[in-house]
């Protein structure tokens, strides 16, 4: 059976039980078409995140979960979700709703309008940060730009949206982001 999923959003969750109901509700509001899937990766939570995900899961066919028994790092949670994703366009973001799922949807739409889908990478941009946080982001951006010889800005901003082809080309992706 051919999957209708075009867009996959991966959201790693670690001890996010207090925020899971709001995250789940917001994802239900934003992603209503079968061309979207949301993969919540319980990354070895020690609170009741996994139980909450199981209780809420039956309410929405677009949302599914992956449960890892032990926390193996944020990056491993992302990679577990990416490996399971069915979409041609992939994304990830944080579970704490610092990035609204609507912003991810806008990222998916923007990505779909780019000319070279295989080489495009959509990245969020954070506004209104404290001066120390902004200064740290500037320093990290300078370091990353020098290291990779490509202009990079605020590498930790969310969401991240890219093609399956881009993901498949990763020879040795980092295991922690």
For each feature predicted by the language model, list its residue ranges:
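Cell-envelope/extracellular polymer assembly enzymes that use nucleotide-activated donors
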Residues: 6-8, 37
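Conserved donor nucleotide-binding strand/loop of the catalytic core
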Residues: 36-39, 50-84
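A conserved acidic beta->alpha catalytic loop
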Residues: 42-51, 97
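Acceptor/aglycone-binding surface of glycosyltransferases and processive sugar-polymer synthases
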Residues: 68-84, 89-92, 101-177
């Amino acid at each position: 059976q051919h999957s209708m999923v075009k867009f996959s959003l991966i959201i790693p969750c670690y001890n996010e039980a207090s925020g899971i109901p709001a995250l789940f509700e917001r994802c239900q509001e934003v992603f209503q078409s079968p061309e979207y899937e949301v993969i919540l990766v319980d990354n070895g939570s020690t609170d009741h995140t996994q139980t909450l995900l199981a209780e809420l899961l039956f309410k929405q066919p677009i949302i599914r979960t992956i449960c890892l028994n032990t926390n193996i790092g944020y990056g491993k949670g992302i990679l577990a979700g990416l490996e399971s994703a069915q979409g041609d366009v992939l994304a990830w973001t944080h579970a704490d709703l610092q990035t609204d799922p609507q912003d991810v949807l806008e990222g998916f739409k923007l990505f779909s309008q780019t000319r070279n889908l295989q080489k495009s990478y959509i990245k969020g941009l954070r506004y209104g940060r404290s001066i120390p946080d902004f200064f740290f982001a500037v320093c990290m951006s300078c370091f990353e730009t020098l290291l990779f010889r490509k202009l990079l800005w605020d590498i930790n901003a969310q969401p991240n949206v890219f093609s399956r082809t881009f993901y498949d080309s990763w020879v040795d992706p980092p295991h922690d982001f």
